[in-house]
Every structure is written in C-alpha cells, then in structure tokens.
C-alpha cells in the first residue's frame, strides 16, 4: 500500500468545520489529510462575510482558547469591528467582525499549508470505505482510495444540495459549486436518520450603484475590539464603516404580489429554514404589521465593490429581486452582481452522534457542521474542532474529550444537538446557556486553554501568553485583597469624584472594586498609582470581583447538577419497565438513549417527576452502587 494513500485522520470538506477539524487533528501530531473539491475555496465565507455576534462570538473565543484558527483569521481579515451589548453585563457582551472575504480565505489557506502533519488534496469524495462496523477510508471521484481509521465529514450544504431562484432550481452545493449527490446517496444507505433543511443568501450589489448619501452610517468601535487572545488591534487591516437602510411598504407590496412565484410558498422547498435569519419573504408574511425591516449594508472586502445587504435574503425570481432591491432607499439605481438564492440540503439527525461527534453507527466516523443541522460559521467551526480533536485522540487510543454545558458554549451546542436534535437550522444564543455568567467571552482562555494544553492542541506561544496573564491576575487579586486604604489618605473631593461619596472607614481595595460603578482604572486613581496590569487583566479582575457572589451561586448549582451529570445510564436500560413513566416519556427516553441522567433531564417533555421515578428504579436495580455514585 502506498504511503501517499495512508493517513491517520481524513477530513472531508474545507469549510469552517473542515479547516478547524484538520488543524485540531494535525496539531496533535496525527498525520492528517484534508480532502476538498476545490483548494481555491478553503475557508470560503459562503454567506455573510462576518464572524461573531451574540452567542457566536463566545464560540469564536472558545475555539481560540483551544488553539483554533477562526479568531486569528477574523483579526487579520476584519475590516469593521463592534462589541455588541456593550452596555449590558459581561455575560452577554459579544464581539462581531465584518471580514474581507479574500483576506479571510488567504489567512486560512496559509495556516493550513504551514501546519505540520497536514496534507491537502483536491478531490471530491464519493464514498466511504467501511469494514464491518468501522470506517477505514474514503473513495474519490477519480477512484482513488485513501485509508484512515478516523474520518471527519464536514460537507456543509453539499449533500443533495439544490439551489432555488423562483420556480427554477438546479443541483448545487452552493452557487458555482457542484453538490455531493453520490456521497449523499451512499450515506442514505446507512442507518442514519436523514431530513432536509434550507438556507438562503441575499443578492449582492455593486456598491458604486448605491447612493450612500441616503443611508445611515454605522461606524465600527473605537478602540477596535480584538477576537484572539493572541491578537492586537495592529493585526487588523484598514477599517471601514457599514451603513443602514430599510425596506418600505412598496418593497413589501412587491414581495406579496410575487409570493406565488416563491419556491418557499409554492411548495417547491420542503426544508425548514433558519428561524433567526428568515428570508425577506418570510419577514413580510410573518410580520405583516411592520412597515419596514432593517438592512445592514456590509462591504465584502477592501479590494471589491461588492456589497452584502444583510437582511434581504431571498429566493424570489430574479426580476422580482431587481424590483424589490430598487424600491429600497439608496438602492434606486442598484446593480445586482449575483442573485440571491435558497439552497435545500440533507442533514443527519445529530441524536445519532456521541458527545465526541463520532457517529453511533460507524466507529471512527465523525460529523461536524451543517451536516448536523446547525447554521453559521462559528457553530460549524466549533464542531469541527471537537470532531477533529476527538478523531486525533481516537487514533492515539486516548479517551475522547468534550466540554460540559457548564464549561463552554461548545458544550451547550453539542449537548443540545445530541440530546434534543433539531428540526430547523440551530443557531447559538447566550440564552441557550444556563450558566452564561461563567461562560463569558473574556474568560474563555481561563476556562479552556489549560485543557487544550493537556490535549496538545495549544502551542508554546499561546501557553506562555496564557500563563503570563493568569499569573498577573492571581498576583493582582492577591494584592487587592491584602492592600487597604484609609480615609485620611484620600481627599474628600477625590473620593466623591471617584466613589460618589466620602471614604468613611478603612477598606480593602477589593471591597471598593466590588462596587458597581468603580472600575479598576478609577481604583488606581483613588490610591494614586498607575495601571499595574494590562487592560485584559484589569477587566478580568474587575468582573471576578463584582460578580463573585453570583459566580459562587452558579458554581454551587453546577455542583448539585453534577450528581445527575455523572450518573451514567446503562445502554441496555429498558425504559418501558420503569413503572410510573408515561408512554410518551418512555418513548422519548428509548429514542434518545441519554448517556447520563443529566442528559435525560434536558429531553423536552421529560419532567422532574419522571426523573425521580427513574432514580427510584435505578436504586432498586442497584445501578447506582455499580457505578460507584
């Protein structure tokens, strides 16, 4: 057998999931092959050229903390940065960057080409090589066979992909790319549960045909935020402004008059679209009382005139697209460079996955990204990292690793998918995390980088930077706990200016920092000292001080929940034998087959009373004693 054809991990697909999967496997020193139908589209931003947002920015920070690429690529390609929810608490603050598509792809490709233990090869995969109940490789359209004990499928919208513009449709993985229909047919022969989803994209506009004088300017933040814990504002290219406009009643009337030509409303499309990123047709129909809908005018890059009008995703016929676009203020003379379209594709029920993202039916086969029913670059990249990491661990005969819900948004994402499944494209929000005060953007490295180091996906540069930051936090926290300030050391006027009231007794510095409106900077001014630490360290110290009580309560709640989380349920448990459970609950438990009691609590329809009955049954059957809990 030729060495060229033998690898330890094969990743199929070069999108956001595939690139993170390949890098995560290769960083462990595992010989990895990334197969893509087109090397030129590695890291392609198929829809909106943006990274981050509410919940999504948290995922990007966690990917970065585990040594992933997305945050660094966003920093090096980001041309417009904003901190969303900046006036709210730290748990829901989220970074978002508008990226230059070409720059982003270039950063991703360079990282892949420079990664040791990683090879790239351009070939479409058409089949899996299966031996018994294990995947052992893949076959390509040229008839080449590549062997590996672990295969990660990150095929996006390419499985059975069909593109719709009006009542016209054709096969396609995305505009300009062929679908993976042969692979889709092969996977349908396996015992996976398969369904259809759809997503869409707006028409692209030539920015030279837009009248910007009629649009509202949306500048980026100053100072400019940074995504990566290794990054700085100096990494960013030139920054530009975005703009805002709105649809109007004329736009809505054009859309309503054309609904009979919409593939969504004519029944041509059966797949369910993303709830939180609906098409403009959906918005007009579902929110008929609204006189207008906001549109964000976002540049596609520094070296192109193309504009992404975020908010008017559509699959209406092209003539209707022209009419609705030109009905919008500032777009009266707009020239469409690419039509909007919807794409319908296969996805596989993620309840057929293990928490490691390995499939339950074929050992060594992992799924990540839109194949699991998610939407978004960030959700895909997070899954890719975990799948690639675990594929690498498996070939090294090591135990799988995946974060719990209380450890990371990545853990929330995976647990939601494998426990509840999804009937629509799944998008991450901060509201999905019950422990979001602990899972902030700012502390993703403190939560995950030590674990990443143990798993060999965090390099020496990141590890040194992390330790410097962590030691600075510990050292400064200790100083603030020990150092005191007396009333006679501060003038009454200075105290009133900085604290809002005179200093009436002796305080430890940490006590003053716990006050809601006292920043670390104000505290240093109060004691007449310069900033002792860098801003990221100061931010972390202030948050930990102000939210100490809330954080402690959440940690106690997690400890209580861990009793359920750690109780593993036997794989052969017959739920129909558990007396008192309703037939509905029995069927749901039997279908999902939760791995732990904690997972069972999160299945929709499984009540606390049902969990109590299950606990009683387990005690009687002596399962608790056998598991040592």
Swiss-Prot record:
InterPro entries: FAD/NAD-bd_sf, GIDA_C_N, MnmG, MnmG-rel, MnmG-rel_CS, MnmG_C, MnmG_C_subdom, MnmG_C_subdom_sf. One of its GO terms (molecular function) is flavin adenine dinucleotide binding. Disulfide bonds: none annotated. GO terms for biological process: tRNA methylation; tRNA wobble uridine modification. NAD(+) binds at residues 273-287. It comes from the Bacteria. Its cofactor is FAD. Transmembrane segments: none annotated. The keyword tRNA processing applies. Keywords: Cytoplasm, FAD, Flavoprotein, NAD, tRNA processing. It holds the Pfam family GIDA_C_1st. GO terms for cellular component: cytosol. SMART domains: GIDA_assoc_3. It is found in: Cytoplasm. FAD binds at residues 13-18. NAD-binding protein involved in the addition of a carboxymethylaminomethyl (cmnm) group at the wobble position (U34) of certain tRNAs, forming tRNA-cmnm(5)s(2)U34. Belongs to the MnmG family. Homodimer. Heterotetramer of two MnmE and two MnmG subunits. HAMAP family: MnmG_GidA. This is tRNA uridine 5-carboxymethylaminomethyl modification enzyme MnmG. It comes from Nitrosococcus oceani (strain ATCC 19707 / BCRC 17464 / JCM 30415 / NCIMB 11848 / C-107).
